[in-house]
UniProtKB/Swiss-Prot annotation:
It holds the Pfam family FdhD-NarQ. Disulfide bonds: none annotated. Required for formate dehydrogenase (FDH) activity. Acts as a sulfur carrier protein that transfers sulfur from IscS to the molybdenum cofactor prior to its insertion into FDH. This is Sulfur carrier protein FdhD. It comes from Mycobacterium bovis (strain ATCC BAA-935 / AF2122/97). One of its GO terms (biological process) is Mo-molybdopterin cofactor biosynthetic process. NCBIfam families: fdhD_narQ, PRK00724.1-2. GO terms for cellular component: cytoplasm. It is found in: Cytoplasm. InterPro entries: Cytidine_deaminase-like (IPR016193), FdhD (IPR003786).
Length: 276
C-alpha cells in the first residue's frame, strides 16, 4: 500500500532564471516488520510491494525457504495522532509463520533499524551478517549468452517508471537466462529492491531461482550477493562495480558475478564458464 511518489514545489535556479516549479519526489517511509507479532526490524523503504519485500527479507535472513513456511502476511492497525480508530497506517506488517518454522532471533537480527542504503548496517554482531543458504547455486548448470546479458540493462532502464519521474530509486530485476524479464521492482534502498523481486518469486513458489539472472542498477555489494545466494540465483549482474567481499562470496558459493555491465562490455569476476 501507499504511494511511491510525492510532490513538492521547489525553487529552481539556473544560469539565466529563477523559477518555482513542481517536483516529483521518491517516497521514503519506515516499515516495521513483525514475525508472529514480535517486532523484528524497521526498514526505510519506498511503499509498494511490501508483502514481497518482507517475505524476500525473511528468505534472505534464512527464516523461510518455501511458500508454505508463511501462513499469512498482513498490515497491522496502529493508533496514531489523528487516527483514533486504529486503522492501518500501512507501515507495520506482521508475518505469521507456519508451525515448526523457527522465528528469527531478534537479539541478533537487528539492533534498531535498517537504513535505505544499507540492510546489514544494523546487525548486532558480525556472526549475524553471514547466512547459510539452503540452496546451492554453484551446482546450477545454466548458461547465459553474453549478448543476452548486454541487452538486460536497457530493459531494466525502460522498466524503471518511478526512477524516470524522480531520479531517486534503485532497481532490481529477475531475468531468465533466455533474456526474458520476469519481474522488476524499484525502491529507495537497493537491498529492498532485491528483497522485493526475491519476494515476488517466493510468493509464486519459484524458490530456488535456478536458471536466472539478478540484475541490480548499482554496485554489487556483499549483501546483495548474499541475497542472491539465499535465493539460489546462479548469476548476479550489476551495472556498477563489485566490492571485494562480494567477489569473495560469489567465488566461494559458485555464483557468476558480472559487473560494469554497460553497453557492449562487462567484467566477469567469478564462474566465467556460465557466460557463452
Amino acid at each position: 500500500m501507499g504511494y511511491a511518489t510525492a510532490h513538492r514545489r521547489v525553487r529552481h535556479l539556473s544560469a539565466d532564471q529563477v523559477i518555482t516549479r513542481p517536483e516529483t519526489l521518491a517516497v521514503e517511509e519506515p516499515l516495521e516488520i513483525r514475525v508472529n507479532g514480535t517486532p523484528v526490524t524497521v526498514t526505510m523503504r519506498t511503499p509498494g510491494s511490501d508483502f514481497e519485500l518482507v517475505q524476500g527479507f525473511l528468505l534472505a535472513e534464512g527464516v523461510v525457504a518455501h511458500r508454505e513456511d508463511v501462513l499469512t502476511v498482513s498490515y497491522c492497525g496502529r493508533r496514531v495522532e489523528g487516527n483514533a480508530t486504529g486503522a492501518s497506517t500501512y507501515n507495520v506488517l506482521d508475518v505469521a509463520l507456519a508451525p515448526g518454522v523457527k522465528p528469527p532471533d531478534v537479539d541478533v537480527t537487528r539492533t534498531f533499524y535498517t537504513t535505505s542504503s544499507c540492510g546489514v548496517c544494523g546487525k548486532a554482531s558480525l556472526q549475524a551478517v553471514s547466512q547459510v543458504s539452503r540452496f546451492a547455486p554453484g551446482g546450477d548448470p545454466a548458461t547465459v549468452a553474453a549478448d543476452t546479458l548486454k541487452a538486460m540493462p536497457d530493459q531494466l532502464r525502460r522498466a524503471q517508471k518511478v526512477f524516470a519521474r524522480t531520479g531517486g530509486l534503485h532497481a532490481a530485476a529477475l531475468f531468465g537466462v533466455d533474456g526474458a524479464m520476469l519481474a522488476v521492482r524499484e525502491d529507495i534502498g537497493r537491498h529492498n529492491a532485491v528483497d522485493k523481486v526475491i519476494g515476488w518469486a517466493f510468493e509464486r513458489d519459484r524458490i530456488p531461482l535456478g536458471a536466472s539472472v539478478l540484475l541490480v542498477s548499482g554496485r554489487a555489494s556483499f549483501e546483495l550477493t548474499q541475497k542472491a545466494l539465499m535465493a539460489g540465483i546462479p548469476v548476479l549482474a550489476a551495472v556498477s562495480a563489485p566490492s571485494s567481499l562480494a567477489v569473495s562470496l560469489a567465488d566461494a558459493s559458485g555464483i557468476t558475478l558480472v559487473a560494469f555491465l554497460r553497453g557492449d562490455s562487462m567484467n566477469v569476476y567469478t564462474r566465467a564458464d556460465r557466460i557463452t
